């Protein structure tokens, strides 16, 4: 009987121990389930974060690609604008050289015009002198003609004085011939000077036309220079703006690359954390 009691007590004790162990196992199971649920919740949260990071990663990659495209386009525009500025600078330099040459030609034409005007004034003065001399010669001829008439009258009235009258007549005729020669020479000189004056007049007209054309050319060059200077300023402004845009885009590219690197690190960290969580779940 005692043996049975002892055995019953032992069985009861074993039962109590089994119950305690069962309770402990149930509690451990509940704790494990709670930890599993918590880990699963953390996994779901990590998956959400990972998905968000992947979306951010893709978005940043797209932004980076677009920023690089914009940067390349702006660099092309900057190169084209710089080439345009260089071409405009060369054209402005050529226009300035042409303008300088035109101004030199205009100055030369003005100098020639001044010299031609002075020559024309000198010829006019000579013409007036010759005209005055011719007029004096004509007056002298008239005087000699009158003297000749008087001499002839004297010859008719005084035959006794024929020798003296003949000498006087011969002298008067010689003087008359000399005067006529001088008149002819003066007329020829006047004609020559008038012809030269006509040539000078034509030269003056030609020089005036050349000067006018040169002045027009200078004005055209000045207008072209003003227009090109305006275009050059616009091109330089565009180049400056393009350069600022390129710098701005370069900063944006650098920022996106940094952000992309940060997201990659976050992605790697989350992936490592998820691997650790899955390993922890596998341990349960």
Curated annotation (Swiss-Prot):
Classification via InterPro entries: Tropomyosin (IPR000533)
SUPFAM superfamilies registered for this protein in UniProt: Tropomyosin
Stored Gene3D superfamilies: 1.20.5.170, 1.20.5.340
Oxidoreductase as UniProt keyword: no
Comp. bias intervals (Basic and acidic residues): 12-26
Region described as Disordered: 1-26, 96-124
Biased composition (Polar residues): 107-121
Keywords from the UniProt entry: Coiled coil, Repeat
Tree of life domain: Eukaryota
Domain remark in the UniProt entry: The molecule is in a coiled coil structure that is formed by 2 polypeptide chains. The sequence exhibits a prominent seven-residues periodicity.
PANTHER family named among the record's database cross-references: TROPOMYOSIN (PTHR19269)
Described function: Tropomyosin, in association with the troponin complex, plays a central role in the calcium dependent regulation of muscle contraction.
This protein's name: Tropomyosin-1
Species of origin: Bombyx mori
């Amino acid at each position: 009987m005692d043996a049975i009691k002892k055995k019953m007590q032992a069985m009861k004790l074993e039962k109590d121990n089994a119950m305690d162990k069962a309770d402990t196992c149930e509690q451990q199971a509940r704790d494990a389930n709670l930890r599993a649920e918590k880990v699963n919740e953390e996994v779901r949260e990590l998956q959400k974060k990972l998905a968000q990071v992947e979306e951010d990663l893709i978005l940043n990659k797209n932004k980076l690609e677009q920023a690089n495209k914009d940067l390349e386009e702006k660099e092309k525009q900057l190169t084209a604008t710089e080439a345009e500025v260089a071409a405009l600078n060369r054209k402005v330099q050529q226009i300035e050289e042409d303008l300088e040459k035109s101004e030199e030609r205009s100055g030369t034409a003005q100098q020639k015009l001044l010299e031609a005007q002075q020559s024309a004034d000198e010829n006019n003065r000579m013409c007036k002198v010759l005209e005055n001399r011719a007029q004096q010669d004509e007056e002298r001829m008239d005087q000699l003609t009158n003297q000749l008439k008087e001499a002839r009258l004297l010859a008719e009235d005084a035959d006794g004085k024929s020798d003296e009258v003949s000498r006087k007549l011969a002298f008067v005729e010689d003087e008359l011939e000399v005067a006529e020669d001088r008149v002819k020479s003066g007329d020829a000189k006047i004609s020559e000077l008038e012809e030269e004056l006509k040539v000078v007049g034509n030269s003056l007209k030609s020089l005036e036309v050349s000067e006018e054309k040169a002045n027009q050319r200078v004005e055209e060059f000045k207008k072209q220079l003003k227009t090109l200077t305006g275009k050059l300023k616009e091109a330089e402004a565009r180049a400056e703006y393009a350069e600022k845009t390129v710098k701005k885009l370069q900063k944006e590219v650098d920022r996106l690359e940094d952000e992309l690197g940060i997201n990659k690190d976050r992605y790697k960290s989350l992936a490592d954390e998820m691997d650790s969580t899955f390993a922890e779940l596998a341990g349960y």
